Regions:
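Conserved nucleotide-sugar donor-binding catalytic segment
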Residues: 87, 127, 145-228
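A conserved acidic beta->alpha catalytic loop
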Residues: 42-51, 71
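Acidic donor-binding/catalytic loop of UDP-sugar-dependent glycosyltransferases
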Residues: 48, 101-115
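Short aromatic/hydrophobic "clamp" motif used to bind/position activated sugar donors
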Residues: 94
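Flexible acidic/His/Gly-enriched loops in nucleotide-sugar-dependent glycosyltransferase catalytic domains
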Residues: 61-64, 69-87, 110-176
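Cell-envelope/extracellular polymer assembly enzymes that use nucleotide-activated donors
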Residues: 5-8, 37, 191
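Catalytic core of nucleotide-sugar-dependent glycosyltransferases
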Residues: 212-216, 222-255, 287-288
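Short, acidic, metal-binding catalytic loop of nucleotide-sugar glycosyltransferases
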Residues: 25-35
Length: 321
């Protein structure tokens, strides 16, 4: 086996004592013909997360490489994966898995590396994920009936969030860190998905090889399980609209293909209209600049915007009751 590290796995953990063993077992049980490392940041957990990580560090010192924080870095606005873990990584490829999710296929890394090693034009390889509702215990695949295939740029940029889960990503090191012009928070790995697809193809494997725990304490799904207020919906849509405007400028400056620019323009215009609907109501589509933008959208995007109008009207009626 070559001594060079081929894959660096980046893992963030905070108060994950109920879940972290599953994540660590998924890491150390990988069967590969190459070396890999797991860089895991414990963000000053107040439970036993750090102690559990230390157990695995002692047992698998060549794999588990922890960083134990004495002060919580996330609360200080630090991007842990970009600023702490990635600079220490050595791998040709980068994988991600948060401490409350886990891998459920011991051949996951080998399958993805095998694909990328034989297809240099690809920026990343991703796969299907099982969603696990921690409130009910129910689970289901993120996608049903899919086949192995390439993800088009249009479908990647069309999604409101990434069209694959974070725990499924294996990408080439050079495409992991998003440039500052495209950095954004609040909607998962959508910016990273778009950036990777701008720089190469993304191959999707139908195999379910990871599990995403939903509604764990402190998770995004737990924080957003209740209906958001009108102001929260506006703030969320504004963040997305700001990002797609950044993306529009970035693509223009980078001189991407007309096909890609058209896809980005369509999405940015859709987001602009959805923000206008939230701020001014559906009637804003009937006149002024919004009408012109709406008429220029593809049929698919027009339907999307009209769905927003219907959903917002229904939500407002319910809030008044």
């Amino acid at each position: 086996m070559n001594d060079d590290v081929v894959v660096s796995v980046l893992c963030t953990a905070y108060n994950h004592e109920k879940y972290i063993r599953s994540a660590l077992d998924g890491f150390v049980n990988q069967k590969t013909n190459f070396r890999y490392e797991v860089l895991i940041n414990d963000d000053a957990s107040t439970d036993h997360t750090a102690a559990i990580i230390a157990e695995y560090e002692a047992k698998y010192p060549d794999i588990i490489k922890p960083v134990y924080q004495t002060e919580n870095q996330y609360s200080k606005g630090v991007s842990i994966t970009k600023s702490i873990l990635f600079p220490q990584s050595k791998g040709k490829y980068t994988a991600i898995c948060e401490g409350d999710d886990y891998w459920c296929d011991e051949n996951k890394l080998q399958k993805q590396v095998d694909f990328l090693e034989s297809h240099e034009e690809y920026a990343a390889c991703v796969h299907n994920t099982r969603l696990l509702d921690c409130r009910t215990g129910g689970s289901w695949p993120m996608y049903k009936g899919e086949q192995d295939r390439d993800l088009t740029f249009k479908e990647v940029v069309n999604y409101s969030a990434a069209c694959f889960h974070t725990s499924s990503i294996l990408c080439r090191r050079e495409w992991f860190c998003i440039p500052d012009e495209l950095r954004a928070n609040g909607f998962g790995d959508y910016p990273r998905a778009v950036y990777m697809r701008l720089n190469g193809k993304i191959h999707y494997l139908k195999d379910i090889m990871s599990v995403y725990r939903m509604f764990t304490a402190g998770s995004w799904t737990a924080r957003n399980q209740n209906n958001a207020s009108k102001q929260q919906r506006i703030c969320s849509q504004k963040a997305r609209t700001d990002f797609t405007e950044k993306l529009r400028r970035y693509c223009r400056e980078q001189g991407v293909t007309p096909e890609y620019q058209k896809a980005v323009n369509d999405v940015a215009n859709r987001d602009q209209l959805q923000l206008a609907v939230l701020q001014k109501g559906g009637r804003c589509l009937l006149h002024g600049p919004q009408l012109g933008i709406f008429m220029g959208l593809s049929l698919e995007k027009k339907i999307h915007v009209l769905d927003t109008v219907r959903t917002e009207s229904k939500t407002e009626r319910n809030e008044k009751r």
